[in-house]
Amino acid sequence: MRYTHRHARLHEEEEKIVTSTVPPVRVAAVPAAHPYVIAVADPAHVRLLADPQPPGVPAGQWWPPQVLLPAWLKAHAADFDLVHVHFGIESYSPRELAETVETLSALGLPLVYTVHDLENPQLVSQDDHRASLAVLAAGADALITLTGTAADEVREIAHRAPTVIPHPTLLADAARPRGTASDVTRVGVHLRDLRPNIDGVGTTATLVRAVADLRAQGARVEAVVRMNERVRDAEAAASIDLLARDAEGVTVERGERLDDDALARWIADLDACLLPYRHGTQSGWAELCHDLAVPVVSTRVGHIAAQHPTDFHSFDVGEPVSLARAIVDATGPAWSAPGSTAREAEVEHRAVERRAELDAVRAAHVALYRRVIAAEAAA
């Protein structure tokens, strides 16, 4: 779906923004240093407070987020206009977050909550996360989520409608690699550090069998499974190595965590990127793949399919036939081939759309901030 259809409502919000003579909104974001948080903050209208350094942690670590502590809020109430929570709520209990909400209410300062994670990818049990989500959803002055389908789920929890503001590009004006041409179809899956929401073993087992089936049918297809050198589940990593050891056309890469530029180059070399989630809500990886014109193959968890539906091709873990079909469907368009002129043209086309979308996303955030500040002042 093209930008003009997808984001007309955001342009309506942009028209409501007051002139640049109004002081910028001072936002205590949780966290402030996250790439998404930086991307959605209009530098002309929003000033992000730096993440307070928690005691006893390495320099640059923002968690546990100090902004959510009542004592910090009281001590710094004059330094910000609102709190905007994105990530990191697992650092505190639902009861502690209720105290955060109560403190902000007593101070007369608004709370905005973007529901990125209906399920926390860092956790196995979701009970505390759901309870914390309910606390913040009930207490926030405004709720945001990234897709219409996620908004429907948030509405069931909070009994009110969130504002839908889509995930913008995080590349902005950064170079967008086009990938290296190859005479084989290359499918890649990055298992990262095997965090709880990554089904590394199930995904790899299904991929090995799907690649074998496709090659048996004469397809020139290869798969690469990448993991970080340091993983959270060594037993799963060993199983993944074993699954791929004798699998023709499948290789396993182990290495240091890729930085942003290296990750973009790795994805750009693929004809299709496989997402290995067992649970989740929305995916920043799907957004990066969209920017790089790399089709996504994924299980139907959360609301990833709603982010860029025409780029999304689903499969079921344990069903290699469904994965083989998804790979064939995903790699059908000419632009899926890395290093091709069609890929280059598609990347450029999307870059233009995404730059316009980023402006609209930032404007929508500023408009929402102004509304909640005005509502609090009028209360």
Name these PLM-found stretches:
Residues 182-242:
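Conserved catalytic-core segment of nucleotide-activated headgroup transferases in glycan assembly
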Residues 318, 332-379:
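A charged, aromatic-enriched C-terminal amphipathic alpha-helix characteristic of glycosyltransferases
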Residues 138-175, 186:
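Donor nucleotide-sugar binding/catalytic pocket of nucleotide-sugar-dependent glycosyltransferases
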Residues 164-175, 193-195, 230, 366:
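Short beta-strand->alpha-helix junction loop in the catalytic core
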Residues 265-281, 291-294:
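Acidic donor-binding loop of glycosyltransferase active sites
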Residues 236-265, 272:
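Nucleotide-activated donor-binding/catalytic signature segment of Leloir-type glycosyltransferases, i.e.
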Residues 295-300:
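Short hydrophobic beta-strand element within catalytic cores of glycosyltransferases
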